[in-house]
């Protein structure tokens, strides 16, 4: 358990106490404890300061290892938690099996850029491990951030440096593995979407070997885009051999010029314009390309999007977008701005073919595509019926204050 390290002598406030730790990410200088996988002895040193003079005292503290329950097929919940939203966990969030702490980035020298994850966030996020929840570090490479990812994966030598730095970070901070969010290989080679598939395969293979050599319990996962195009940048059959799980990003599946669901479970075959792509379509593609169902994790979006349709018919669904633009909005905002005005200018719709909810705001002429308790229930049933690994959430901090969506996930994953 955590303990308090006092800053002043209890009987003499003129005596100051300063603390250092031989392993600050096992026991912090403030007494936060983050256990590892093995018993660890940490030396705490107290500096007693009075009248400009210092005296030092040291004591060894033994930290017992943490243990985790085995991840159960069709019962595993992964929750991404972005650093910019993290404050502390709710009771429901701690019922996730794995937290993907987001994000670290790749520096030009292939070290990890942890600037978004200060000590306050790290200690707070890693506290979940004491509740039996694994905490994995997610490394992002999106847009321009792809370049350093690309360079790091390019050669055997660059990969060795990159992987060594990753493993060092996992062991230093007591993470339980790594999640790769490289979006996307081939970003800087337009027209050659699969140009870095081999480098990606080599990276995941060598990283997996390095992690498992340190601890067979370490996880290696990857977020890979859903839909009909993004997967073409990856050799799915090969890379899936070296990944414990693949997080299928089954959201943002709308097309900007049309009024679509962004995270529908099924496509509407009879009305093909009702959705650009779906969870089922994406899962089918990944299985066809050689990914075992037991490694596929489908995404649940704790956010939605809105656009202005040209026509209000059927709430705008299936028509054209007036400005070919969607605006992203958290579920918390959807609940406050739109759902609070049901029957007061906002109409709720359920698309039973696509198993997706949507709203039409007649006051502002908005079509809103989002996730709710009913669509979460449908997705979890689909996941179980198809023998998939579980579900993942992007992103825990976008839920309502009352935890509407995480409660639905937990209830349906029991």
Predicted regions located by residue number:
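Extracellular/luminal low-complexity segments enriched in Ser/Thr/Pro
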Residues: 27-39, 43
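Append "Rare intracellular matches occur via the same short Y/T/C beta-strand/loop motifs
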Residues: 40-52
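Glycan-recognition patch characteristic of GH18 chitinases/ENGases
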Residues: 66-170, 406-408
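Conserved, mostly hydrophobic/aromatic
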Residues: 99, 137, 180, 207, ...
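Glycan-binding loop/region signatures in secreted carbohydrate-active enzymes
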Residues: 139, 300-382, 409-414
């Amino acid at each position: 358990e955590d303990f308090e390290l006092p800053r002043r002598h209890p009987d003499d406030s003129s005596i100051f106490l300063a603390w250092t730790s031989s392993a600050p990410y096992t026991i912090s200088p403030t007494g936060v404890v983050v256990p590892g996988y093995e018993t660890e002895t940490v030396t705490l040193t107290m500096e007693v300061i009075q009248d400009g003079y210092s005296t030092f005292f040291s004591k060894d503290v033994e930290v017992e290892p943490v243990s985790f329950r085995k991840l159960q097929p069709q019962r595993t919940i992964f929750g991404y938690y972005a650093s910019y939203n993290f404050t502390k966990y709710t009771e429901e969030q701690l019922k996730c099996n794995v937290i993907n702490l987001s994000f670290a980035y790749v520096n030009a020298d292939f070290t990890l850029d942890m600037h978004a994850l200060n000590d306050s966030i790290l200690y707070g996020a890693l506290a979940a491990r004491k509740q039996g929840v694994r905490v994995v570090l997610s490394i992002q490479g999106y847009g321009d951030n792809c370049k350093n990812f690309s360079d790091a994966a390019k050669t055997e030598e660059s990969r060795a440096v990159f992987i060594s730095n990753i493993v060092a970070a996992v062991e230093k901070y007591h993470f339980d593995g790594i999640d790769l969010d490289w979006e996307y290989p081939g970003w800087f080679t337009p027209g050659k979407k699969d140009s870095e598939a081999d480098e990606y395969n080599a990276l995941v293979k060598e990283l997996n070997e390095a992690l498992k050599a340190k601890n067979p319990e370490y996880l290696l996962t990857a977020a890979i885009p859903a839909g009909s195009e993004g997967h073409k940048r990856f050799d799915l059959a090969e890379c899936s051999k070296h990944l414990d799980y693949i997080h299928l990003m089954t959201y943002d599946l709308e097309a900007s010029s049309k009024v679509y669901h962004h995270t529908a479970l099924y496509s509407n075959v009879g009305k093909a314009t009702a959705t650009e792509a779906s969870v089922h379509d994406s899962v089918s593609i990944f299985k066809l390309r050689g990914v075992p169902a037991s490694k596929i994790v489908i995404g649940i979006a704790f956010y939605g999007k809105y656009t202005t349709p040209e026509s209000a018919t059927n709430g705008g669904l299936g028509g054209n977008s007036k400005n070919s633009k969607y605006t992203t909005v958290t579920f918390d905002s959807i609940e406050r701005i739109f759902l609070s005005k049901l029957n007061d200018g906002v109409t709720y719709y359920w698309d039973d073919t696509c198993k997706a909810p949507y709203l039409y705001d007649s006051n502002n002429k908005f079509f809103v595509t989002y996730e709710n308790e009913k669509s979460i229930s449908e997705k979890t049933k689909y996941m179980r019926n198809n023998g998939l690994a579980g579900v993942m959430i992007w992103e825990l901090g976008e839920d309502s204050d009352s935890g509407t969506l995480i409660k639905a996930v937990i209830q349906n994953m029991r």
